[in-house]
C-alpha cells in the first residue's frame, strides 16, 4: 500500500461570486431562451448577449437563471392570466429567511403544492433566485405568482386539490418551463430509514447517492429526473449544485428526513452524466462543497465532482458465478497476478485491459488477478490506497460499465477477480469525506483514534453504526454490482491495534484498558460474515502483519472470519535469506524453515507483492545477490520454492519476467525485457509453474493441513539445501511430489535424499533447464529410487542438484 499525506481539496468557506464550482469552467455555453417572432421562444447560445439583459450585464453575472440547461422553452400563449383564488400564500418571515439562506430543514413544507386549509384551493410556492417572474400552469390556465421574498420565493393559489401543474420561470434572457422539484414524496421509505438508523442496510447504495428515476404525479403524469440522498446528520442545511443549476445551489435546498440524518431531493430534468456536489452548511456555520460519498461515477481526477450514472450493462458470466458458488478455494489452486491497472501498460482503458490483460493472464496460467484499489482516489501516487469515492471505480480508465466489462471478460476466460479494499482510513481532502457535515462524521472525533499519523489520513469511526453500514454495504456493493470474487482488506493491523504506530500516551485504550480495537474486530467480523452469507465462494483476504490469533478462523468460533491471510512473515524471512550471499546463508537457514512452525495456524497466501518492489527496495531480481547469472538463477529457484511451499500464491506484475527496475506507478512495465532470452526464460518458468500447480493436486489440496507436507531434510544448512514432500489425498503412488531446492552457489553431485518408495521418479521441473536460461545441469529427466532407507523414509535416490536451482520429482 501507499499512504503518502496528500491533500488536494480546498475548503469551501462561502459562496463563490459567480455561483460556479472552483475547479471547472463556466458552463454557461448552454442554450438560453430568447424571444423570437410570433410570440414564441427559440434557443440561442448563452454566450450571446441577451436582448433583455440589463445595461452592463454579462453572461457571467450571477443573475443567470437557476434552471436546467436542458429545460425546454415554453410557448407564450396570448391568453390572459387566469384568476387565482383569493387566499393567502404568505409565509412567516423567519421561514422565508431560513429558506433562501439554505438553512431550512424541510423546504418541502414551504415549497411545492399544499392544500389550502378551509378552501378547495392549492397553494403553490416556488424558489427561483434571480427570476423576474414565475407563472404556474394548470392545463391551459396561467396563474402569475407573487414574489414573497427578494431571495426568489414566489407563491400563488390555484383552484382544485393538488392538480397537476408546471412552472414557467422568466429570467432576464427569457422563460423556461420546468417541473416542480418540491411536489414529490421522499424516495426513501420508512424501512430504509429504519435500517439506516440501525446501521443494517445491506443495499445502502440503492437508496443513497444519485438515482435516475421516473416519478408519477397525482394526475398520472410521468416526471423524469434524478433523486439525490446524502447522510449529513449535523448539517444545518444541504443544497444541491451541479450542471443542472449552473453550480448555483440556491434553487435546490434539500429536505432532512428526521433523525436518520438523510437529506433528500428529486430534481426533475436532471439525468445521467450530470456532474454534481452537495453544498453543506456545516454545524460550524461554514458552507462546503462535498462530493457524494455514494457516487457511482466521478470526474477524471484532478477534477472532483460526482457524476450521475445508471448502469445498463448485461452480464455474461453466469457460468463462472455458478462454479464459484460451488468452489472451496482452500483446497483449490489459487495463483494470483497482482496488477496496478494504470502502469501494467500505460494508457489502456478498461476495455483495452479487458482484451490485453485477460489474454496475458490466461497465457501465463494464473487463476486470479488482484487489482490494486480501483475505487476513485484523487492522487495517483497513492496507488489507490487513499480513497475518496468508495462506490465509484476510478474514471481514469473509463465508466463503471466499462469496468464491469473488464470483470465480465476475465470471468468468461476463467479468471477470478480480487480487488484491494481500504476500510482502514481515508484522505483529508476537504471536498471528500473528512468533516463532512462540519463535524467529525466518518472519522473518529478524538484524533488519538481518528487520525493515522504515519499516513496523514483520517481513521473511520467503526463504532458508529452508520459508518459501519457505509463500509459493510460498500464491500457488498463490489460483489453485487461488479461481480468481483474477493476483497483483499488493506492494513488490517492498523485497524486492530489502537496503539498502531502511535507513541506512548498518543492512543486511547479500549473499555478493558487494552490496545485491541474492539470496534474494528466487530466490524471485520460483521463484514466477513455478511459477505460469505450473501456470496458463496467469495474470498475475503487480510493483509495482516502481526500474530493476531484467528484471522481466518470462522466468526462463530471467535475469529475474524477471513478466508485467507497474507503470510507476511514468510515473505520477509524468505526475501531476507535470499538477499544474502550464498556463503552466509548457512547461518540463516532457520529463516526458511520457520514458516512451517506456524504454516497451519491460518489459511495463508504467500505474497511477493507491490510493497516489496518500491521505495528503494529494488525489484525482486535486484534483491538477489551476485552477478546477473546468479541473480536470475536465484530468482528462478526462489519462485519454484514458493510454488512448492504450502500456501496460495501471489506475484506482483513484472516479477513474472524478472523486471530489472523497481516498480514505478507512472511508467509501464519493462516489456522490452521479454526480448532477452534470460528474462523470457523466467516468464516461461512462471508459466510452467502455474501449469504444474493447476494439475498436481499435491501442490494445493492440503495447503492448510499438516497431512499435505513433510520434510525430507530441513537441516542441511551446510549445503543450503531444503527438501520436502507435498502430499495430496490421492493414492500415495501418484499423490506425492518431492521438491528439492539448492540455494548454494555451487551444484551438488551425488546428493542423496530419502523418498517414500522405490522406483523411477520423473524430474518434472528443473529451474536450471535451457528453456529457462539455465545451464541444464540435472538428472536427465528422471532418477531411480532404491530400497535404501534415508531421512527416515523407506527409499532413497541420488541426485545432481544445479547451483541456485530447484527440481521437482514425481513418481513415474
Swiss-Prot record:
Similarity comment: family membership: Belongs to the glycosyl hydrolase 13 family. GlgB subfamily.
Compositional bias (Polar residues): 1-11
Protein name: 1,4-alpha-glucan branching enzyme GlgB
Entry-linked InterPro entries: A-amylase/branching_C, Branching_enzy, GlgB, GlgB_N, GlgB_N_E_set_prok, Glyco_hydro_13_cat_dom, Glyco_hydro_13_N, Glyco_hydro_b
Disordered: region residues: 1-83
Known partners and oligomeric status: Monomer.
UniProt keyword list: Carbohydrate metabolism, Glycogen biosynthesis, Glycogen metabolism, Glycosyltransferase, Transferase
Highest taxon of the lineage: Bacteria
EC number: 2.4.1.18
Source species: Frankia casuarinae (strain DSM 45818 / CECT 9043 / HFP020203 / CcI3)
Tagged with keyword Lyase: no
Catalytic activity: Transfers a segment of a (1->4)-alpha-D-glucan chain to a primary hydroxy group in a similar glucan chain
Gene, per the UniProt record: glgB
Gene Ontology CC terms, in alphabetical order: cytosol
Signal sequence coordinates: none
Active site: 490 (nucleophile), 543 (proton donor)
Low complexity bias locations: 49-64
Bias (Pro residues) ranges: 65-83
Its job: Catalyzes the formation of the alpha-1,6-glucosidic linkages in glycogen by scission of a 1,4-alpha-linked oligosaccharide from growing alpha-1,4-glucan chains and the subsequent attachment of the oligosaccharide to the alpha-1,6 position.
Pathway: Glycan biosynthesis; glycogen biosynthesis
GO molecular function, one term: hydrolase activity, hydrolyzing O-glycosyl compounds
Catalytic EC class: transferase
GO terms for biological process, alphabetical: glycogen biosynthetic process
